[in-house]
């Protein structure tokens, strides 16, 4: 029996959206969170140059601009952080994203020394890290840096998780999967594109082939190749449409595998994993 309806309900995906309304919904969500927590004045997000961080970043910037205007409190701001490992091959894309976002402040924190130091420390302890595992260390180090900045600036860390990513568990546990607030949650991949189009983004910012690009042995590996299923199929599934049995089984397999990522650390009272 297909899990489709249950998953759609859990992730809150609509079969169709009005982009302008969803932009407003995300902006109001971000603003309400900051207003509810008066000790928070900053939104922090790592910008990779991909669709998701570009969209979340622009939403964050617009949200703090509105708060400054509406409250008169000029201390609200958005900090965008570039977090390359060494030299990023598609740095030009990241710069184009920043030009669209127009953040109040941009920081660059190169994570290479921290990641390599961790790998070497593990090696000295007799633990040889695989390329895949090193990729997860990169993702977690990026979040360490974002939380360090947030901690020094009275900030909250934005996550870029959305429905098409959540359903497949295509994120690093306590890496990019760790954040304070998720303004894109409920949207699938094509709906995120629609929001960027509505916001006037250049097509190159949302038509770029999605890639986590964490593995050095597989540079630029496309998400769809890693997942074995297309975002078109994932989006159709999340919108309640019929897809091939093979694609459906693949998506639901990823859903089961990623259950542990969608929960806080397991307690004795949890039974979802049994």
Swiss-Prot record:
GO terms for cellular component: cytoplasm. GO terms for molecular function: ATP binding; glutaminase activity; metal ion binding; NAD+ synthase (glutamine-hydrolyzing) activity; NAD+ synthase activity. Pathway: Cofactor biosynthesis; NAD(+) biosynthesis; NAD(+) from deamido-NAD(+) (ammonia route): step 1/1. Mg(2+) binds at residues 52, 165. It holds the Pfam family NAD_synthase. GO terms for biological process: NAD biosynthetic process. Keywords: ATP-binding, Ligase, Magnesium, Metal-binding, NAD, Nucleotide-binding. Its EC number is 6.3.1.5. Signal peptide: none annotated. It is an enzyme of class 6 (ligase). ATP binds at residues 46-53, 160, 189, 211. It catalyses: deamido-NAD(+) + NH4(+) + ATP = AMP + diphosphate + NAD(+) + H(+). Deamido-NAD(+) binds at residues 140, 173, 180, 260-261. Homodimer. Catalyzes the ATP-dependent amidation of deamido-NAD to form NAD. Uses ammonia as a nitrogen source. Belongs to the NAD synthetase family. NCBIfam families: nadE, PRK00768.1. This is NH(3)-dependent NAD(+) synthetase. The gene is nadE.
